[in-house]
A protein has these predicted regions:
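Acidic, glycine-rich segments within the central catalytic cores of soluble metabolic enzymes
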Residues: 48, 61, 149, 157-238
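Hydrophobic/aromatic beta-strand patches that form the interior of the parallel beta-sheet core
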Residues: 41, 80, 130-132, 209
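Glycine-rich phosphate-binding loop and adjoining beta1-alpha1-beta2 segment
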Residues: 38-79
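Structural scaffold positions in well-ordered secondary structure
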Residues: 17, 33, 77, 104, ...
Length: 238
């Protein structure tokens, strides 16, 4: 492959992403960024991302077990294990943030700040920095007390109404074989980051992006939600 063709196939080459996400939604987003050529550095706890232990697990030649989620969502990334509760770990993480183009995290709202890692302060130091937070309901600023509630993708699928829309004849929601809310949220985060990068090219300014899993699922249900508001039961349409 020629250099010019390779560059075209990797439009994000040279973009440094520091990735504090875990499990599925965030790692899927950063996997898409890595596929587009970004240099993604995945920051994991000392025991590793919990996705490393999610089934299905495959046995490697050395006898160790490796998760399908770990392989499928982390190809092409670099990884480092850091104890962010230690002063040394915190200082290392802040140094990494200060040299990044994009920082993305999926901790509970406010968790990084409790560790002494302030993404808002990082953006004041470097106004071009793009920061992204993924959570179930969003930040305290946008979701209020709901931000304190923790949960998994299945809650977003239920509260958005998407699970109900796919109920079976008995009215029960389906058992999803694909982590739909996680993957959709990762895709929404990816598109928001790329859009923010385009805005930065024009203005020189970065921004903070607040991604709420429930809201990404509500966006998928837009047609049904609007339809329910305009439906006239007395004059149903064919």
């Amino acid at each position: 492959m020629s250099e010019s063709v390779h560059a075209q196939s990797q439009p994000l080459r040279g973009v440094k992403v520091v990735d504090f996400t875990h499990v599925l939604a965030g790692p899927y987003c950063t996997q898409l960024l890595a596929d587009a050529g970004a240099d993604v550095i995945k920051v994991e706890p000392m025991v590793g991302d919990m996705a490393r232990f999610m089934p299905p697990l495959g046995k490697m030649p050395d006898g160790s077990l490796l998760s399908g989620a770990e392989i499928g969502l982390n190809r092409g990334k670099r990884s480092i294990a850091v104890d962010m509760k230690s002063p040394e770990g915190r200082d290392l993480v802040i140094e990494m943030i200060d040299t990044a183009d994009v920082v993305i995290e999926s901790f509970a709202p406010g968790a990084l700040l409790k560790l002494g890692i302030d993404l808002g302060a990082a953006r004041l130091r470097r106004p071009s920095l793009i920061t992204v937070s993924i959570s179930l309901y969003g930040s305290h600023e946008t979701a209020g007390e709901l931000a304190n509630r923790k949960g998994l993708a299945i809650i977003a699928e239920a509260e958005s109404g998407v699970a109900w829309m796919h109920r079976d004849a008995a009215g029960k929601p389906p058992q999803q074989k694909v982590p739909f809310a996680d993957m959709n949220t990762g895709l929404c985060a990816y598109s928001a980051i790329v859009t923010a990068m385009l805005g930065r090219e024009r203005s020189g300014e970065g921004k903070h992006i607040d991604i709420a899993m429930v809201k990404t699922m509500l966006s998928m249900a837009t047609v049904s939600i609007v339809g329910s508001q305009i439906y006239d039961a007395d004059n149903p349409q064919p």
